[in-house]
Every structure is written in structure tokens, then in C-alpha cells.
């Protein structure tokens, strides 16, 4: 629906954006930093990070030219995301720099003896870490700060490259779930942008979510769709909320999800992705144990300095064992069990 017609939601979105922006403003002022460096991809997360950084610079009275947007195309970059990244940077009045990383990544593959035709985790993470190295070095060049783009959903699932996009100097999206990222970007587009910028932002909202680390298909379209690989974010964000905020066990989360998403996902699909959620949430904790600073936006956070302190070698066996037993609707669960 048209978010401009929902004043209540608009107030919520504005508060959430303000928390992110004022958090970054405080860090910029504390460090006397006049420059920010962002890897801009044309995807949702880097777009929200850029919008937040623009707001923070405006609040500080710093010229937007101090926001250095770096686009780093490689094997999987599509025209759609590249063009949106370039257009949005120019529309917002930020500085743009393009660094094609293909040559550097190929040299790296040659150095370590990796076949470029083998599209495995080494192939993907090599690109992500090359990008992070560039951002960090440009931050040194400009006396700037690398702004992290990863969101809460990605961190919960470990859908980030360790010491790649996982790392920054201040992560503005770390407590914002992916489903909310999309709504925030759309709200800004509908309420706070001129016509050209609005069109760019709405196209970004409608672009399939992808890290673009695998080459595009024969038509130049995104081949690597994140939700095909790890599952729908609306399910994972649902699981995450009721697991962290309410402390519910897998059977109750399954019960609630089966009814909430009835007609959208059948129970076998929900069970499949619930298993993925618990497996990944536990075995990816090591990435969350060393997260950069960032603001807490909503009611849950997985910062090791805040809401969530968990050993990296914690076992998921008990939770996964319960997921395996799920086969019927859990009507025996007490209806009065609610969030505290």
C-alpha cells in the first residue's frame, strides 16, 4: 500500500531512521571525522546505509561530498544494480569512485592457485574481501570511516563474508532486519525524495536480493538469488523475533509461523527453513562475536556488547532435534503463552 497514507507507520520509520542517523552523527563528532566511505552496490542494504549517512552528514553540517561511494564491479555485477548505484550517488550529491576489481581478484586467484571457473566459497569470498580491503584503504586515504551495510537478518544467518562485508568501522544496519530495510528505503523514496531519486530507490526496492558474486545469466540478469539459497527473509525475520525477543522454542515458533503464513507457505516449507535458521544461527555465531559498533534500532539486537552474548561453539543439537520432530500443527500449545 502507499506508505504516504500511513502516518503511524511513517512516524515509526522516521524514528528508526533517526536512531541510525543520530548514532552515526555521534560517532562522526566523537572522532572528528569529516569523511565516510561506503561500498555501494545498488542493493537494499548499501542503499539504506547511504541514506542514513546522508542524513547524518546533514545533521553534522558536513558537505555530502565527504561521503565517498565506491562501486566495485566484478564477475556478478549486473547493469541494473551498477546503474542504480551510480545514479543514486549522483542524485544525492555524494562523491563517486569506480574501481573494477576483476584484475585484482584474478591476480589473487592466481596467487593462491584457485581456478576461476570453480564458483565455490573461495571464489565468492575472494571478491568480498577484496572490496573490504579497498574500502579500508580509501578510508585511510581520506581520514574517513568505513560505514557497514550488513543487516540484522544477514548477521543472524551468517550471510556475510568473515572479515569481508562483515567488517566495517561503524555498522548502521546491524539491528535492522531485511524486511524492515525494504520498508525504510521505500518510505524514504515516497516521502523524502525528488522524482528522479524516488524512481531509482523504488527500482532498488524491486531488485531481487543478491550478493552478485556469481556471474549473471545469459541475459545479463541476476543468477544468484539469496532467498532461493537461504530462504525467505519474511520467514527468517519471523523466526528471529520470536526466538530472540520471546525466547520461544522451535515447536511454538513453528506453530505460530504455520498460522501466520497459512496459504503462503505450507508446513513442510516452514519446517525446512526453520531448520536452516537454527543451524545457521548457531554455527555462524563466531561472526557475531566480533561485530563493529552500531546503533540498536529495534527491540532486539545480536551485538556481543548488548543483548546477545553467546559462545561461538554453542551446539544447536537440541533445537534441531526438536525441529526434526515437527510434523503436525501444535494445537496443544497453551494459547496464553505470549511474549514477556
What does each model-found stretch correspond to?
Residues 62, 66-122, 128, 154, ...:
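A conserved beta-strand->alpha-helix junction
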Residues 2-13, 332-340:
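Single conserved hydrophobic/aromatic residue that forms the stacking wall/gate
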Residues 27-34, 55-67, 77, 87-99, ...:
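Secondary-structure transition/capping motifs at alpha-helix termini
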Residues 20, 28-60, 253:
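A phosphate-binding catalytic loop at a beta-strand-loop-alpha-helix junction
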Residues 16-18, 22-23, 29-33, 138-155, ...:
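Long hydrophobic segments that form regular secondary structure
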Residues 203-230:
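Generic long, charged, amphipathic alpha-helical segments
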Residues 251-333:
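Intrinsic disorder and flexible/low-complexity segments
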Residues 57, 92, 116-194, 213:
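Active-site adenylate/phosphate-handling loop in enzymes that bind or generate adenylated species
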Amino acid at each position: 500500500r502507499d506508505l504516504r497514507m500511513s502516518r503511524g507507520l511513517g512516524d515509526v520509520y522516521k524514528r528508526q531512521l533517526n536512531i541510525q542517523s543520530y548514532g552515526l552523527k555521534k560517532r562522526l563528532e566523537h572522532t572528528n571525522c569529516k569523511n565516510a566511505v561506503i561500498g555501494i552496490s545498488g542493493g537494499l542494504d548499501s542503499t539504506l546505509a547511504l541514506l542514513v549517512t546522508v542524513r547524518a552528514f546533514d545533521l553534522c553540517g558536513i558537505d555530502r561530498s565527504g561521503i565517498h561511494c565506491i562501486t566495485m564491479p566484478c564477475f556478478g555485477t549486473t547493469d541494473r544494480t551498477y546503474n542504480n548505484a551510480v545514479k543514486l550517488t549522483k542524485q544525492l550529491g555524494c562523491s563517486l569512485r569506480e574501481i573494477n576489481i576483476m584484475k585484482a581478484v584474478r591476480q589473487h586467484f592466481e596467487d593462491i592457485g584457485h581456478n576461476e571457473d570453480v564458483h565455490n566459497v573461495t571464489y565468492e569470498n575472494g571478491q568480498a574481501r577484496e572490496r573490504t580491503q579497498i574500502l579500508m584503504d580509501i578510508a585511510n586515504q581520506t581520514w574517513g570511516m568505513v560505514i557497514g551495510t550488513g543487516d540484522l537478518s544477514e548477521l543472524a544467518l551468517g550471510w556475510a563474508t568473515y572479515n569481508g562485508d562483515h567488517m566495517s568501522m561503524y555498522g548502521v544496519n546491524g539491528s535492522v532486519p531485511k524486511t524492515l530495510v525494504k520498508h525504510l528505503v521505500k518510505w524514504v523514496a515516497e516521502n523524502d525524495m525528488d522524482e528522479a531519486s524516488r524512481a531509482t530507490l523504488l527500482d532498488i526496492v524491486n531488485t531481487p536480493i543478491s550478493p552478485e558474486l556469481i556471474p549473471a545469466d545469459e541475459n545479463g540478469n541476476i543468477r544468484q538469488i539469496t532467498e532461493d539459497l537461504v530462504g525467505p527473509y519474511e520467514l527468517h525475520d519471523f523466526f528471529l523475533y520470536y526466538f530472540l525477543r520471546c525466547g520461544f522454542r522451535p515447536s511454538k515458533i513453528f506453530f505460530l509461523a504455520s498460522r501466520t503464513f497459512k496459504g503462503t507457505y505450507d508446513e513442510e516449507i516452514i519446517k525446512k527453513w526453520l531448520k536452516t535458521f537454527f543451524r545457521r544461527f548457531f554455527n555462524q555465531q563466531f561472526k557475531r562475536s566480533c561485530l563493529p559498533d552500531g546503533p540498536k534500532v529495534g527491540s532486539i539486537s545480536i551485538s556481543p556488547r548488548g543483548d546477545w552474548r553467546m559462545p561461538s561453539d554453542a551446539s544447536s543439537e537440541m533445537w534441531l532435534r526438536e525441529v526434526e520432530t515437527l510434523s503436525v500443527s501444535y494445537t496443544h500449545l497453551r494459547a496464553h503463552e505470549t511474549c514477556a
